[in-house]
Swiss-Prot record:
Name of the protein: ATP-dependent RNA helicase sub2
Pfam families: DEAD, Helicase_C
Keyword Zinc-finger recorded: no
Low complexity biased stretches: 19-29
Gene: sub2
């Protein structure tokens, strides 16, 4: 079997097939349920004392993390943990399984990065932590988060593996005991190929993490890869799963991988809104979109903007048009080579470009703190995709602005679905525009 056959690029593909057998309801987790405001906490292993924690901690020091981690946290400028971090970290470091759904930008990544680094006792030549996500860009970003927080842990080695790059380079890393990673981050296709080729050994894995887990477990082919990798790990390990959206249907599937997990749902169900993010729509015809976009980019103040379109072809065309109009734009989508995608991602993250035209490959998990404007040039197909997209402009409770173009009957149906799903009434964008002080931090 060729490696290319193993390496499916899941970035822009939605596989609609569902596995009916896998959606059988799992038994509910044991343990009490504690409802505090918009935060629901349940589960946790009953035999573990101290499995439950209030949300009154005021600093990362309260979690009793390693001193090296606390130094790195201070260097990053973090003072107070977010709500989801306060609830999850104290329990997760006790080796309890965690299923966490919290809206975009609330620091879910730091939960598993800090937890696994705190627990890790690195052994040369052994992989102890495995983190999987559905896109290469997100894998690259998670690897960078590990680098940030492990700066005072010199013995910890992290590597990222994803499709679109020569697999031989990955094999070279895994063939050398000096470079063999203690923490592996990657996409399921490439990781499964490395496991099948017996280049990556998972027999010492102690923590198994899925980020944006619903995206991976919803798609049947990706779920099979995840299951195959899961079976290659020891039975006695900690499992943690995170996402901004976890439907009632996907939760039992997640829990099939777990043992009595701590379940944390922040702003559950219809309350999945992004505080501080102003959301508007504009009704117009398809032919009016370019002129209106030009007007918005000319009139609005913003640090960085991300413009979402529905296809790679439209991304290229719009990017070309913007550059012809002297807007500093780049395009990121699955049609761009992997090396070029990472290069463009870094250009945008490092503020060398202010405008990014993207497909849904940038719709989940990507964290670029300067984005404060998101424009849906093409409305997404469903409400959850909308949440992930506009969430790029409201990270960690900061202010932001999102504007969606509505140009067809299908768009109007999606708009109604968004309003129904999140129990909000999206206002039409005012003719006189909006005051920049209301969305500029």
């Amino acid at each position: 079997m060729s490696h290319e056959e193993d390496l499916i690029d899941y970035s822009d593909e939605e596989l609609q097939t569902t596995d009916a057998a896998a959606t059988t309801a799992a038994p509910a987790a044991n343990g009490a349920q504690d409802k505090k405001g918009d935060l629901t906490v349940s589960g946790g292993r009953p035999d573990k004392k101290g499995s439950y924690v209030g949300i009154h901690s005021t600093g990362f020091r309260d979690f009793l993390l390693k001193g090296e981690l606390l130094r790195a946290i201070t260097d990053c400028g973090f003072e107070h943990p977010s709500e989801v971090q306060q609830v999850c970290i104290p329990t997760a470091i006790l080796n309890v399984d965690v299923l966490c759904q919290a809206k975009s930008g609330l620091g879910k990544t730091a939960v598993f990065v800090l937890t696994t680094l705190h627990q890790l006792e690195p052994v040369p030549g052994e992989c102890s932590v495995l983190v999987m996500c559905h896109t290469r860009e997100l894998a690259y970003q998670i690897k960078n988060e590990y680098a940030r927080f492990s700066k005072y842990l010199p013995d910890v080695k992290t590597a990222v593996f994803y499709g679109g790059t020569p697999i031989q380079k990955d094999i070279e890393v895994l063939s050398n005991k000096e470079s063999y990673p203690n923490i592996v981050v990657g996409t399921p296709g490439r990781l499964n190929a490395l496991v099948r080729e017996k280049k990556l050994s998972l027999r010492n894995v102690k923590a198994f993490v899925l980020d944006e887990c619903d995206k991976m477990l919803d798609q049947i082919d990706m779920r099979r890869d995840v299951q195959e990798i899961f079976r290659a790990t020891p039975a006695d390990k900690q499992v943690m799963m995170f996402s901004a959206t976890l439907s009632q249907e996907i939760r039992p599937i997640c829990k099939k991988f777990m043992r009595n997990p701590l379940e944390v749902y922040v702003d559950d169900d219809t309350k999945l809104t992004l505080h501080g993010l102003q959301q508007y729509y504009i009704k117009l015809s398809e032919s009016e979109k370019n002129r209106k976009l030009n007007e918005l980019l000319d009139s609005l103040e913003f640090n960085q903007v991300i413009i979402f379109v529905k296809s790679t072809l439209r991304a290229n065309e719009l990017d070309k048009l913007l550059r012809e109009c002297n807007f500093p734009s780049i395009a990121v989508h699955s049609g761009v080579s992997q090396e070029e995608r990472i290069k463009r991602y870094k250009e945008f993250k490092e503020f060398n470009k202010r405008i990014c035209v993207a497909t849904d490959v940038f719709g989940r998990g990507i964290d670029i703190e300067r984005i404060n404007l998101a424009i849906n040039y093409d409305l997404p197909a469903d409400a959850d995709s909308y949440l992930h997209r506009v969430g790029r402009a409201g990270r960690f409770g900061t202010k932001g602005l999102s504007i969606s173009f509505v140009s067809s009957e299908e768009d109007e149906k999606v708009l109604k679905e968004i309003e129904k799903r999140f129990e909000v009434a999206l206002p039409e964008y005012p003719e006189g525009g909006v005051d920049s002080s209301t969305y500029m931090a």
